[in-house]
Amino acid sequence: MNVPLGGIWLWLPLLLTWLTPEVSSSWWYMRATGGSSRVMCDNVPGLVSRQRQLCHRHPDVMRAIGLGVAEWTAECQHQFRQHRWNCNTLDRDHSLFGRVLLRSSRESAFVYAISSAGVVFAITRACSQGELKSCSCDPKKKGSAKDSKGTFDWGGCSDNIDYGIKFARAFVDAKERKGKDARALMNLHNNRAGRKAVKRFLKQECKCHGVSGSCTLRTCWLAMADFRKTGDYLWRKYNGAIQVVMNQDGTGFTVANKRFKKPTKNDLVYFENSPDYCIRDREAGSLGTAGRVCNLTSRGMDSCEVMCCGRGYDTSHVTRMTKCECKFHWCCAVRCQDCLEALDVHTCKAPKSADWATPT
C-alpha cells in the first residue's frame, strides 16, 4: 500500500498503536515475589528506575501493594467469570496475564483500571490499619463539620484515600510516563479512571452518642466501601468503554465513531477491537474456551452457545456433597444433613483441528 508523504500524519495514530512496545505492568508480578524488600525490588523484572526507587524507600507499602494484587485479580476474575476471557492469570509469567493485554482492547482497559484501583485500596487500607510508616488516618478530618443531619465531630479513623491515590499515581504511572506512544496514554487514562472509582465510593459513617442511643452527638469518619462496589462500577464502565484514536499531534484522543460522546476522565478507553477468545491463539494470548464450564439454560455470555462459540459441548454426570434438610434448633443453631446431589456439568468441546489449552 502506497501512502503519500502528506498522508503520513493521517496514518500516524494507527502506526502509534501498531508499533506499541510491550506494555505489561511488571509490578503486577509483585504478588509472586516474597522475601526482603531488596529481594522483592530487585527481582521484579521490568520496573523502571522510579518504581525501584519507591520500592526500596517504602518496603512496607510494597508489601501492601503485593497483597493487593491477589485482591484485584480476584475481583477481575469475578467480573469476567461468565465470559470467554475470564481474566485468567499465568503464574510463571511476569506480566501476569501473558500476551493478551498487549492488544489495546477493552479487556486491557479494564485490567489497568482495576489494578490501579486495587493499589489505591490496598495502600489506603494499610494506612488506616497502622501498617505503614509514611501515612496514617486522614489528618484533615479533625474538629467539627456539618452535613444534612446537622453538626458532627470528626473522630475515629478516616481512610486517607488522598495518600493512597498520590502514591498509586507515582508508582503505577511511572512506567507509562516514560513512554510517549499511544498505548502509554491509554494506560494513563485508564489508571486514572481506576483511582477515581475508589474515591467515588468513599462514604461517611457515623456513631451516635446520647441518652438511650439518641443522636444528640455524632462522631463521623470517612470509610472506603467494599472493593466489590469499585469492581461493579468499573465493570459497567467496561461495557460502556469508548473506542478512540489518537489526535494527529499525539497528545490526546478523539472518538473513533463520531456518534459517540467524548470520553470523560471516568470512562475507560481502548484502541483495538477484542479477539473473540474462542480458540487458543498464542499471538493473541488467548487460551480459548475448550474445557470451560457453560450454562445450558442461560441466554447470556455464559450460555453453552456463546461460551463454546458454536462448537458444542460435552456433558458429564457428576455427584457432589451438599447440605440438605436443614433445621433450626432453639437456640441458636442450624443443623443439616449431608446429601449426595447428582447433576450434569457441561463443558465446551475443543476445536476439531486445533491444539487447545487445558481448561481455564
Swiss-Prot record:
What tissues contain this protein?
In embryos in the developing allantois, pericardium heart, and ventral-lateral mesoderm; in adults in lung, brain, heart and placenta.
Q: Does the keyword Glycoprotein feature in the UniProt annotation?
A: yes
| CDD domains with a match to the protein in the record | Wnt_Wnt2 (cd19345)
Where are the annotated glycans?
N295
Q: Which GO terms describe its biological process?
A: atrial cardiac muscle tissue morphogenesis; canonical Wnt signaling pathway; cardiac epithelial to mesenchymal transition; cardiac muscle cell proliferation; cell proliferation in midbrain; cell-cell signaling; cellular response to transforming growth factor beta stimulus; epithelial cell proliferation
Task: Kindly list the GO molecular function terms attached to this UniProt entry.
Answer: cytokine activity; frizzled binding
What name does UniProt use for this protein? Protein Wnt-2
